[in-house]
Each structure stands twice: as structure tokens, then as C-alpha cells.
């Protein structure tokens, strides 16, 4: 008999083996096997015509035209998990043959298809597999297998591998584990099915890894790519979720991964690592708190037959890391060595920014943890009194990297080093690294004597090189500052900034040596705050190899990461690339940005609007003008001063009044953070009231988005909890924004009852969640190697209070639900507002809009920006069950306008975390490019034709999504700006193009496409980004000015014309706004940077607050350098507020003089470059202040005989990077 099979790829090998054995046994069968990895094609149909039977085992999503197949062969049997697809009386039994599986059942199925009566062999659906033997009961296994090791590890793997004879990965893992541990390898069918006597994965965990309701393993390796599901508790019949099951085990759950689509060679050379696998092999399991997705297997494919094969070196890595975790668990607390890594924003000044952590007081957080460790019995001594004392101790000892004001000689003299690593010791380790890694490091940095520039952090002792590893020791607790990663020496310029001209720049010798030292001396490493550089070092996106720098540096040491619960994009990168277990922390309390100094002015304005009496209105005009003069609203003050000189204050009052009202309304409609969060501390008193009030206001906004009280949060709940819709938040039915909300919150917290019972219940619920937050307790559980419960992440200011309680190992969302329906609708509004504003200002449609598409759009806003991109193109998503399953082109007559072209600079995190979203947008672009429409109504097609005429291929002409090179993160421009390594806009354009001209899409990944990028940028009419929350703004990170600013500058330079820059605002999705970039810079300056309320909040945090202020001012300078959109009054007011103001200057000098130096230096540079035009008096005063600061810093060297060479405050414009750029193939 001749049979053609169309099978799931994973069944093809076992089926072939069965058929070949039958032939050897004399059975007359001929066969052809096709894998469902490929759709049914003409070759299959031709074969079907010549065979006796066509057998199809399909999935519910396979696109199979059964009627078409029957035209070639009517004898077709279809089998599927869904009985609705069965078409034959034989389908049911064939399904059982396949489901029970194994060689015997596949042989019997073939014989059954040939007309022989064969029974299904009923193999168990769960059990313990060990050394070729299956045990269905735990007791039987424990009696038969001797446990002679100290620790026990469980493995949970899919029965599918066992019955399909695809066990290479499992066997290799088991063999390696056997050398170190007792092992309990459990196989499970996954889903519970009583008809098959299949318990399901969750119940299998309870059956085989617990005895007498107590765990018998120290760690679990979960190789499943689907949730454990829920089981019924036998005691009370309640359902127990997968997370509750793992909490019963209370051990770390490791999740090594396999590539289901790539061979070993493909994976090894692929810069992406994994791609299509990410959603279901990594993202979904993270919902149950699994950790460390290290790849251990790939799929080899030969003639359509697939087998999984283990990667022994990666398996070895997994086992070594598990061993370190278990050893940590059993080590006495008094002997455990803990190392805290504080981050450092080197480009924004090493000395000014120690302890960088978004919205977290990292120093006080570490002190709180150290004190708790001591209480718990850890050996911790000489704990500083508070966080400020810790910060000052680090700076007094200079336990940091070299920079403009810090030399190695100073570090050594002041005792800021932990260890001096001998050259021999370092090279013994260095020589164990892969050959191409060593070569790249040596090519970039040379040996320990340096290359082009002296090697960083090297101290010579008796003529021998010693690598200086900095930090402070407090008994068995170490506090270290993360080393610099892309530059070296006591300078910051275009010569030492190697990363400026090399996105693949490896970390320095000292960086690698430091992490090697951390691995050797400590039992666990804890990175403090969002975020550092480790997880962003070059390497694969996910599924890293031993040639990827995060994998090299983290080594085998257990890794906990204190991370802001509002930042899932970057936190998820840390989980997947540096094997971090996240302990998330609460977000900052957000308060109304309106401040006391404006209240009298506001009351006059309110009175003026109501007053009808002309004389009183005239009097109020005087009062308003005088009151403005008392504020820091410099822009209005300057206008008033000019008009007063002309004697026309009353004639021009309406113009002043309208602008003043707009400014005050803008401040009223904004919030600012009240200082920073301190890890382990809960907001109390007034802060607790403000915190809950801001959450309730956000719930009101989200539940009423697009006139739907429930849609937004319901959709987010399903995206955040796929398969668990009831785990999300119930909607809150507000009918209006309550003006008395603050009092009501306060009353409930003080035990009073209020009339609105639903609101009262909600306040109590949020308050209870806050109280349950036990951040330090969770961290201590992590150090004890226990299970850290997972939880959702995102913005509280978007109503997502399900992120409470904090102290959890957060997860992201289901990427295939993006954009949600409500997010797409917001995107439509945003697109319409932007187009209409441009139409009003320019009188024509924009042909090409260049956008900065950040991962926060997906993680915080469910893809509003992505929805906007699709709608600009005239495309909409097609949904099935809440998931995006395709795209539909909107007809031109329905769209009512031309299709707008888009040029997208996507963030590296979006590229790596959401490849499906990248591919979907690229598919939309391709669809539009291929439409048969007039060029004047389809700007995508118009620009494709233009590029074809310039000699580009069709695919190159459709490249619209660009990013940095694969495995790298950054934009290039920020390095040039911070290092002062630029002379004109052309230089910044060159840096941007060099770093960002790599195309991404459905069939292209990181293809260098400079011509395509430059050509499409020449057609750009405007650039765009958006704000979704007041927690983060365009001064909040250097990526904003580096990418959006860099994009704007590049478009302007290449086009040779003005390119407008706009900013969208979806903080309130019911009231979407579009502003110019200049207006957004003004808004953020007034509501935060120059806001006395915000400044006082920062000042409460001493050194850390001063550093954060300086960083934001550096980004103001960055925006001015890249776009020239910062008005003079903003620089003037920065000078007045932070340098000229005696009280604030004193604060900086006492707490962080380096932050003050950085502020003053950037102001001087802005003036020297013509970015800031101000009075000679201001400049003279600034120069005097700077000389005083310089003198104060230099006094700190007085006790050091030989300080060595350092740059200090000079601005040295070194353009050697451009020569390197050209030699690197610009």
C-alpha cells in the first residue's frame, strides 16, 4: 500500500522509523512524509494522485483545502486534536494511536490504515523516566533509585519527547545533572484529560515533587512551553493556579529553552538567537515565574524530519548555575557573601551619577537592605547611618571608575579599590574565552597596556599591570559601582569613546575582570535599580551563546535585580539576557504639578474670568502682571518686560493672558513625582493618600477611554494574563472625576465610611495591596533561593494597580494581542490629530512621517503608536479572539486621504522583544507598496518608485523599519553629544546614520542599508514621538534626544529643508493631543525640571537627587544640540535655579559638587556652541561660579602626591571617531 502523510513536524521522525521497521518486517508499504512546517503544495498534490491513501494530521490553524486535495485523491483521512476536523470512521482511533504515541502505536496505526485490526498500546501520560525505565509512582522510583547526592533537582518535560523518541536534549541534561545531583525527571502530557488518565502538568508537579505535602527537590527545571494550568485542591476542592502550585514547591524554577526552528549552526551564527519562538517558549512561561531562559537544544532538519539535539556547553552552563543557587540556599547566612552593584551613567558624568536608578533612591535602599541582612544573621559591619552617608563614602574613597575628575592614582590613594588583579590571573581567565571574543576585545582595547589610548583602570606596581576593581566592603557585603563599558581613562572625548564608532564595542578588560572577581568572591549579585549596562552588552537578543557578553560577564553567579515595576521592556531584557530574577519595586508617588507659588496668580486669573466690572478687571490686570514677576515663568516675564517698555501692557494683555492661562492649565493637567521610592518602604500619611488618589484618577481615565468603561482594562487584563482572564482587574465604575476624591481617600484610610460604597471598597483594596508589598522580604527570599512569585508590570498612572503588591518577579504581556482594539482606536485619533495639525500649518498632507517607536508603546499603551503607524498607512488589524491574526487594507474611499509613508526608528528592545510586531508593520508597508493606486494617493508607493529609479531593489525601496545593528542597543548620537565629539549638524547626522541604518522586517534582520535609509529620510516632512505618562518624559532618558533628536537632525540635514518635530500626548486617551516638540520641551521644563515642588522632592535624596537633576539638564542640552528646539529662557531659568540660586548651589556643593560641575559645564558649552543666547552678565557669573567649583574639586587632591593626568572641565572636541567610522565602512 502507498500512503502519503502530512504530519506535525515533531511526529515525522517517529513515523518514518515505524514505517522503516514495518518494511524490514516484510510489510508491503510505500510512503512519502510531508511536514506541516510547509504548506500543502503542488508536489504534495501530485504525490497524492499516485498514492492509495492520503493521511493528514493537522492543527486547527493549518490552511488546508480538503476539497482541492480530494480532486487528486478521494481517499483522505484527516485527524486532529479537534474532532470537528475528523472526516473518517478511522479518524478517532488514529487520533488515539498518535496521542498515546510511541513506536509501537505508530506501527499499529499504519497497519490499521492498511486494514488490519490493531489495538492502541496505552502508555502512561505522566511518570518518572530514568535510565530507560518508567515509574508511574514516586514511591516506586524512590525505592528503586539510590539518592546518594546532597541535593535534588526535578525536571519537568513534555511526554511528547519521550513517546516520539526525541530525547537527546533530555538525556544530555539528565546525564550532566546526574554528576551533581539526585534527579527526578518527570514527563507530563500537559493538559488534564480524565478519559486518557492524564493528570496534567500541574497535578504531576504535586504528585512527583512533593511528599507528605513537602517539596523533595531543591530546584525545578521546567522544560514545558505552556502553563501548568489549574488543579483542584483535594482538601477543599478549590482550584489552585500554576503559581500557587509553584509556591507550594517554593524552589527556583529554571526554564532552559530549545529552538524549534533553528539548527545548531543556524542558531550559532544568528545574531537574533530566537525569533518566532519567543512568544510561546519564553514570554508565556514567564507568567508563572520561571527564570533563566538559557538555550540547551536546537532542531536539526533533514528532508523534513526533525530531531532536537542538546547543546552540551549550554547544558553545562545551566547545571553550574543551578548548583550555585542550591549551594547559596544551604550556606549559613553568616557566611553568605552578597554583592550590590550600583549603576552609573558614565556618559552623563561618572562622578555625578553613581547609583543611577530610575525613580529609586538606590543608596538608602541598599542601606535598608543591609540593616535587614544584619538582623537576619548575615555578617555585615560598619553600615553607614543612611544612604547619603553611603554615597559620600563612595565618593570620598573614589570607589568608582576613572573619569574627567578621577584618576587611578586617586582611587588607590583614597582606598576605593577592593582588589588589584594580577595580569597573570586575568589572562588565565581571559584565555578561557572563545577565540573570536578574545580577538574582538584585543582589537578594540589592545592588551593591558592599551591601544590608541592607555588601558583603563590599570595601576602599575613594580612595573607590573594590575587591574583595579573598585568597591567598598562591609563584612560579607560588598557595594560596587558598575564599571564603564565603552570608554577608558580619565577623560570623556571622541578619542576615548570607542563605542561611538563601534556599536559592537565589547566591554573593557576591567569590566570583564570585575565581573570575574564578583563571580569568584560572592555567592549572589544584586543589581540595584533600573538599569545598568550588563544586560545591554553585545550579543544575541535571547538564547545567548558563550560568545555573548552578558552571558560571559554574569558567569555562574545567582543574580537578583531590583527593578522598577513600571519598566517591563528593559526589565524583561535583564531577565532574558543576564538571567536576572526580578524583584520589582513600587513606583514613585505622583502628585499634581501645580505648586504653591502659582496659587495666588491662579486665583487672580479665575477672578478675572468671572469679573464683569471694567475697573476691577483693569486692577486685576496689574495684579496678575505683578504676580507673574514673582514666579519662575521666565518666558511670560520676558514678554511682559518687553511690552512694559513699550508702554502697551493693557493693549496687549489679552495675548499675555491667553498664553498665561495655557501655561497654568498645562501645569495643572500634569503630574510630577514627589521624590523617589526607597526599596522596602511604603508610602505613608499624605503620600499614601496621593498615591491612591492618582491610581483612582487613572482608573477613571482608562475605564472611560473611547466612551467605554470596561474595554481598556479588560483588554489589558487578557493581554497581561492570557488564558487567565479573571486574574486581571475588575473595572471601576466612575461616572465623573471626583473633585473631593482626596478627602474621600483620606477618610477611608482613617477608618471613616463614605457614601460611595464601591469607591470605598476600591480604596480599601488598593490600600491592602500596598500593605502586602514586601520588597525586602522578597529579596531575602531570593537570596534564600526560594520561588519569587510573578506579577504583572506597567504603569500605575494608567490604572494598572494589579502590579501591587510589589516585590514580585514581573512579566510582560502576550505580544500577539498588540495593538489591542482600544489602542488601535487611540492610534487612529493620534494620527488624525497629527495630520490635521500639519495640514493647518502647511496646507498639505505630510508625505512621510518619521517616528521613534519605543517598547513602552507596547508595554504601557498596548500599541497605540503601532496603531497610529498602521492607520497612517491606511491599514487596520484583523482580530480573532482578541489576538491579531492579520491585516486589512482600508480602501481609499473609506480612508478619505492619501496613505502616509512612515520611516520608523524602532528601539532595540522593541526589535528584540516583539519581533512579531515588527513583522506585522513591515507586512503592512509591503501591502501598501504593492497596491494599484495613484502615486499622489499612496506616498509609500510614490517613494518606492523614486527609490527604484535610484537603483535600489524593490525590497530595499520598501525598507522602513530601522535600528542599531543586531545585538546592540543605542543610537550613536548620545555618545557624540556627551563626549562633545561634534562640530556641526553634519557630524551628528553621520553618527546617527552609521548607528541606525540597519533594516528589519519579515524577511530581513539587521541588513545594513545606508542608501535606503538616507533616501527615505530625504522625503520626511515631520518627526514624531509621544508621551503616555507623566512618570516618564523626554528628559527622562538620553535615548529620547539621541534617537528622536538624532532622527530629526538627520532628516533636516539630508533633506536640506526644515523638518517639523511633533510630540503626541496620550496620557489621557480620552483627550489625545499633539504639540510641537518645542511646546513639549516647555511643558516638561515647567512641570518638572523648573518646578519647585519637583526640585524639593529631588533634594530630599541628597547626592542621588542632585545627580538626577544634572542628568535631566544634560538631556536638555542634548535636545538643543540635536534639534535647536530649546528656547533661551529655559537655559536662563536653569542657570537661575541651579547655579545662581544660592540655596540650591549650596545644596549641590554639600551633596554632589560633580553634578553642579556637570550642569555649569553644559551651560557653558551650550553658550559656546551658540545654542544658548543670554546676557554677558549671566555668562560672567556662570564662569565665576564654574571656576569656584573647579577650585573646590581640585582641593580634594591636596593630599595626593601624584594625581596623574585628567581632563577636568575642559571641552575637548576630538573628531578622530569620524576617521574610524569611515575606516569601519561608512
Swiss-Prot record:
InterPro entries: CobN/Mg_chltase (IPR003672). Transmembrane segments: none annotated. GO terms for biological process: biosynthetic process. Belongs to the Mg-chelatase subunit H family. This is Uncharacterized protein MJ1441.
Amino acid at each position: 500500500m502507498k500512503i502519503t502523510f502530512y504530519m506535525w513536524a515533531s511526529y515525522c521522525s517517529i513515523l518514518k522509523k515505524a514505517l522503516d521497521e514495518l518494511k524490514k518486517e516484510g510489510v508491503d508499504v510505500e510512503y512519502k512524509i510531508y511536514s506541516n512546517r510547509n504548506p500543502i503544495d503542488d508536489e504534495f498534490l501530485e504525490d497524492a494522485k499516485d498514492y492509495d491513501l492520503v493521511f493528514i494530521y493537522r492543527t486547527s490553524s493549518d490552511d488546508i483545502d480538503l476539497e482541492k486535495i480530494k480532486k487528486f485523491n478521494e481517499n483522505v483521512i484527516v485527524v486532529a486534536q479537534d474532532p470537528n476536523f475528523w472526516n473518517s470512521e478511522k479518524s478517532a482511533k488514529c487520533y488515539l494511536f498518535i496521542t498515546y504515541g510511541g513506536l509501537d502505536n505508530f506501527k499499529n496505526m499504519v497497519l490499521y490504515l492498511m486494514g488490519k485490526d490493531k489495538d492502541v498500546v496505552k502508555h502512561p501520560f505522566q511518570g518518572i523516566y530514568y535510565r530507560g525505565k518508567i515509574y508511574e509512582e514516586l514511591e516506586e522510583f524512590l525505592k528503586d533509585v539510590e539518592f546518594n547526592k546532597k541535593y535534588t533537582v526535578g525536571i519537568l518535560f513534555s511526554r511528547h519527547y519521550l513517546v516520539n523518541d526525541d530525547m537527546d536534549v533530555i538525556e544530555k541534561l539528565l546525564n550532566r545533572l546526574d554528576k551533581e545531583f539526585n534527579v527526578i525527571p518527570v514527563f507530563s502530557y500537559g493538559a488534564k484529560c480524565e478519559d486518557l488518565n492524564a493528570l496534567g502538568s500541574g497535578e504531576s508537579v504535586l504528585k512527583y515533587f512533593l511528599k507528605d505535602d513537602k517539596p523533595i527537590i531543591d530546584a525545578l527545571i521546567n522544560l514545558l512551553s505552556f502553563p501548568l494550568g489549574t488543579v483542584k485542591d483535594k482538601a477543599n476542592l478549590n482550584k489552585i493556579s500554576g503559581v500557587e502550585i509553584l509556591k507550594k514547591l517554593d524552589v527556583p524554577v529554571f526554564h532552559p529553552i530549545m529552538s524549534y526552528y533553528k539548527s545548531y549552526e543556524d542558531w550559532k551564527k544568528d545574531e537574533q538567537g530566537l525569533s518566532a519562538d519567543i512568544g510561546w517558549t519564553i514570554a508565556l512561561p514567564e507568567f508563572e515565574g520561571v527564570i533563566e531562559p538559557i538555550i540547551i537544544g536546537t532542531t536539526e532538519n533533514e528532508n523534513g524530519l526533525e530531531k532536537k539535539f542538546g547543546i552540551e556547553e549550554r547544558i553545562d552552563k545551566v547545571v553550574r548555575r543551578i548548583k550555585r543557587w542550591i549551594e547559596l540556599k544551604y550556606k549559613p547566612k553568616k557566611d553568605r557573601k552578597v554583592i550590590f552593584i550600583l549603576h552609573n551613567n558614565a556618559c552623563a558624568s561618572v562622578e555625578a551619577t553613581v547609583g543611577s536608578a530610575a525613580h529609586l533612591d538606590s543608596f538608602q535602599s541598599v542601606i535598608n537592605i543591609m540593616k535587614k541582612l544584619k538582623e537576619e544573621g548575615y555578617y555585615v559591619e560598619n553600615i553607614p547611618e543612611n544612604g547619603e552617608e553611603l554615597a559620600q563614602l563612595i565618593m570620598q574613597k573614589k570607589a568608582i571608575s576613572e573619569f574627567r575628575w578621577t584618576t587611578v592614582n586617586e582611587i588607590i590613594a583614597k582606598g576605593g579599590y577592593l582588589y588589584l588583579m594580577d595580569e597573570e590571573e586575568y589572562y588565565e581567565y581571559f584565555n578561557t574565552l572563545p577565540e573570536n571574543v578574545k580577538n574582538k576585545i584585543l582589537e578594540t582595547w589592545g592588551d593591558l597596556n592599551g591601544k590608541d589610548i592607555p588601558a583603563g583602570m590599570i595601576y602599575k606596581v613594580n612595573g607590573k599591570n594590575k587591574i583595579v576593581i573598585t568597591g567598598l566592603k562591609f563584612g560579607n557585603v560588598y557595594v560596587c559601582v558598575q564599571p564603564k563599558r565603552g570608554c577608558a581613562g580619565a577623560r570623556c572625548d571622541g578619542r576615548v569613546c570607542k563605542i561611538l564608532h563601534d556599536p559592537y564595542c565589547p566591554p573593557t578588560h576591567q569590566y570583564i575582570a570585575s565581573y570575574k572577581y564578583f563571580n569568584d568572591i560572592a555567592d549572589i549579585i544584586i543589581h540595584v535599580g533600573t538599569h545598568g549596562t550588563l544586560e545591554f552588552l553585545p550579543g544575541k537578543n535571547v538564547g545567548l551563546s558563550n560568545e555573548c557578553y552578558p552571558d560571559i560577564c554574569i558567569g555562574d553567579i545567582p543574580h537578583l535585580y531590583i527593578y522598577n515595576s513600571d519598566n517591563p521592556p528593559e526589565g524583561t531584557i535583564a531577565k532574558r539576557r543576564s538571567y536576572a530574577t526580578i524583584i520589582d519595586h513600587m513606583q514613585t508617588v505622583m502628585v499634581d504639578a501645580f505648586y504653591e507659588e502659582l496659587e495666588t496668580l491662579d486665583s487672580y486669573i479665575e477672578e478675572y474670568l468671572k469679573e464683569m466690572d471694567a475697573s476691577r478687571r483693569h486692577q486685576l490686570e496689574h495684579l496678575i502682571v505683578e504676580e507673574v514677576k514673582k514666579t519662575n515663568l521666565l518666558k511670560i516675564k520676558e514678554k511682559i518686560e518687553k511690552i512694559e517698555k513699550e508702554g502697551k501692557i493693557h493693549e496687549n494683555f489679552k495675548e499675555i493672558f491667553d498664553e498665561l492661562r495655557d501655561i497654568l492649565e498645562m501645569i495643572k493637567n500634569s503630574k510630577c513625582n514627589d521624590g523617589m521610592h526607597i526599596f522596602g518602604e511604603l508610602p505613608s500619611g499624605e503620600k499614601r493618600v496621593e498615591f491612591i488618589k492618582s491610581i483612582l484618577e487613572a482608573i477613571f481615565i482608562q475605564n472611560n477611554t473611547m466612551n467605554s468603561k470596561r474595554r481598556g482594562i479588560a483588554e489589558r487584563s487578557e493581554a497581561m494574563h492570557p488564558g487567565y482572564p479573571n486574574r486581571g482587574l475588575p473595572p471601576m465604575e466612575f461616572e465623573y472625576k471626583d473633585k473631593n476624591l482626596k478627602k474621600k481617600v483620606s477618610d477611608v484610610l482613617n477608618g471613616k465610611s463614605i457614601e460611595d460604597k464601591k469607591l470605598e471598597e476600591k480604596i480599601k483594596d488598593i490600600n491592602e495591596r500596598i500593605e502586602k508589598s514586601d520588597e525586602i522580604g522578597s529579596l531575602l527570599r531570593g537570596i534564600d533561593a526560594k520561588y519569587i512569585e510573578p506579577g504583572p508590570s506597567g504603569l500605575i498612572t494608567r490604572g494598572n494597580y494589579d502590579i501591587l503588591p510589589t516585590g514580585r518577579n514581573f512579566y510582560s504581556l502576550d505580544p500577539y494581542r498588540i495593538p489591542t482594539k482600544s489602542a488601535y482606536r487611540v492610534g487612529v485619533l493620534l494620527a488624525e490629530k497629527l495630520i490635521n495639525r500639519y495640514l493647518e500649518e502647511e496646507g498639505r498632507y505630510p508625505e512621510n512621517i518619521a517616528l521613534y517607536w519605543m517598547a513602552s508603546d507596547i508595554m504601557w499603551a498596548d500599541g497605540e503608536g503601532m496603531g497610529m503607524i498602521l492607520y497612517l498607512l491606511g491599514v487596520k488589524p484583523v482580530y480573532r479572539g482578541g489576538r491579531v491574526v492579520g491585516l486589512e487594507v482600508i480602501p481609499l474611499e473609506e480612508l478619505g486621504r492619501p496613505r502616509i509613508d512612515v520611516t520608523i526608528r524602532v528601539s532595540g528592545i522593541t526589535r528584540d522583544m516583539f519581533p512579531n510586531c515588527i513583522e506585522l508593520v513591515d507586512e503592512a508597508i509591503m501591502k501598501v507598496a504593492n497596491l494599484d493606486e495613484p502615486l499622489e494617493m499612496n506616498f509609500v508607493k510614490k517613494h518606492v518608485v523614486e527609490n527604484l529609479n535610484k537603483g535600489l531593489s524593490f525590497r530595499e525601496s520598501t525598507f522602513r523599519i530601522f535600528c542599531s545593528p543586531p545585538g546592540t542597543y543605542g543610537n550613536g548620537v548620545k555618545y557624540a553629544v556627551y563626549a562633545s565629539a561634534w562640530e556641526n549638524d553634519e557630524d551628528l547626522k553621520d553618527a546617527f546614520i552609521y548607528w541606525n541604518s540597519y533594516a528589519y522586517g519579515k524577511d530581513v534582520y539587521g541588513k545594513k542599508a545606508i542608501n535606503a535609509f538616507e533616501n527615505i529620510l530625504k522625503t520626511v516632512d515631520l518627526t514624531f514621538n509621544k508621551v503616555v505618562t507623566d512618570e516618564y518624559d523626554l528628559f527622562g532618558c538620553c535615548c529620547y534626544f539621541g534617537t528622536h533628536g538624532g532622527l530629526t537632525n538627520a532628516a533636516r540635514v539630508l533633506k536640506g529643508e526644515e523638518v517639523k518635530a511633533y510630540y503626541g500626548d496620550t496620557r489621557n486617551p480620552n483627550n489625545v493631543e499633539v504639540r510641537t516638540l518645542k511646546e513639549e520641551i516647555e511643558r516638561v521644563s515647567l512641570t518638572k525640571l523648573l518646578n519647585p515642588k519637583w526640585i524639593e522632592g529631588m533634594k530630599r535624596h541628597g547626592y542621588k537627587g542632585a545627580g538626577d537633576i544634572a542628568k535631566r539638564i544634560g538631556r536638555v542640552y542634548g535636545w538643543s544640540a540635536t534639534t535647536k528646539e530649546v528656547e533661551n529662557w529655559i537655559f536662563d531659568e536653569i542657570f537661575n535655579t541651579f547655579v545662581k540660586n544660592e540655596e540650591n548651589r549650596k545644596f549641590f556643593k554639600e551633596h554632589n559638587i560633580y553634578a553642579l560641575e556637570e550642569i555649569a559645564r553644559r551651560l557653558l558649552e551650550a553658550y559656546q556652541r551658540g545654542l544658548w543666547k543670554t546676557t554677558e552678565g549671566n555668562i560672567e557669573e556662570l564662569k565665576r561660579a564654574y571656576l569656584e567649583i573647579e577650585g573646590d574639586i581640585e582641593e580634594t587632591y591636596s593630599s595626593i602626591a601624584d594625581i596623574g593626568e585628567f581632563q577636568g572641565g575642559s571641552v575637548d572636541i576630538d573628531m578622530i571617531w569620524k576617521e574610524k567610522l569611515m575606516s569601519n565602512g561608512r
